[in-house]
Amino acid sequence: MQPFYKRHFLRLMDFTPAEIAHLLALSTKLKADKKNGIETRRLQGKNIALIFEKDSTRTRCSFEVAAYDQGAQVTYLGPSGSQIGHKESIKDTARVLGRMYDGIQYRGYGQQIVETLAQYAGVPVWNGLTNEFHPTQLLADLLTMQEYLPGKALSDMTLVYVGDARNNMGNTMLEAAALTGLDLRLVAPKACWPDAGLVAECQAAAKQTGGSITLTEDIAAGVAGADFIYTDVWVSMGEPKETWKERIALLKPYQVNMAMIAATGNPQVKFLHCLPAFHDDQTTMGQQMAEQYGLHGGMEVTDEVFESAHSIVFDQAENRMHTIKAVMVATLAQD
């Protein structure tokens, strides 16, 4: 029986550096097996519940395709498709679903919700995104980085995240750096830095792996020598519009544009984004931003960068599926 069997996947820091490396290696193998048409279905007869309190494209599709590839069946419970937290407590929901399903994915709000599900379900629970952490995304990011710099260890790579770093992406990048030895730089206004306690915890852990975690407002110094530039949206649909103007004004200097790409001094630097991205005005929200704030060429990233050879965001998006598959196989398959 392998060491991941029946374990939860709630946040990266629940695992050792060796375990994260194992999941990445398994992801690589599963991706190659699928491409070569030799994938072994190790989840035949398994039933998986997908709880989504927040809608999603990539996470839902990744879990569903990964499950089907491996022979499992899924039940999708959308924002209006379950009684969780409304008529039925999280604890009770966990105990009901745990009797019917072999694994449960949760994407929604507080980390405490997914932790409670894990405490009471009796089956593996996987965090598809909470307000605090997004571990399946970072697993895909690390795989993508390995693929684009095959001659380098993660511990020899420099990842720069620019923009709003006080969110689940910033938090999870801190944990990823601590576990892999990355040179991580969070380049953001101080008002957008992650929780100081988590930063200190991850900086201490990074000393054991040779990692480096830097927080700075200095864009030029922060991006110099980067292997990868990463950003995320500045505003989300659920946030009150009154906050948008102030947030955009605060973060506008941190937009990923060709000047920032050039400032890295690395002509091979790659651009990452967890998507969706506001890089043009071809969406309802993109049009709003263009009309109200004059952001016609993109918000957190310009369309020029997004569509350039630097951008590897669609390889990154594909890798969500392969890494999620690895997590499910590792935690549900006995051999």
From Swiss-Prot:
Pathway: Amino-acid biosynthesis; L-arginine biosynthesis; L-arginine from L-ornithine and carbamoyl phosphate: step 1/3. Keywords: Amino-acid biosynthesis, Arginine biosynthesis, Cytoplasm, Transferase. L-ornithine binds at residues 168, 232, 236-237. It is found in: Cytoplasm. One of its GO terms (molecular function) is amino acid binding. It comes from the Bacteria. Its EC number is 2.1.3.3. Carbamoyl phosphate binds at residues 56-59, 83, 107, 134-137, 274-275, 320. One of its GO terms (biological process) is L-arginine biosynthetic process. It catalyses: carbamoyl phosphate + L-ornithine = L-citrulline + phosphate + H(+). Reversibly catalyzes the transfer of the carbamoyl group from carbamoyl phosphate (CP) to the N(epsilon) atom of ornithine (ORN) to produce L-citrulline. This is Ornithine carbamoyltransferase. The lineage of its organism: Bacteria, Pseudomonadati, Pseudomonadota, Gammaproteobacteria, Enterobacterales. The gene is argI.
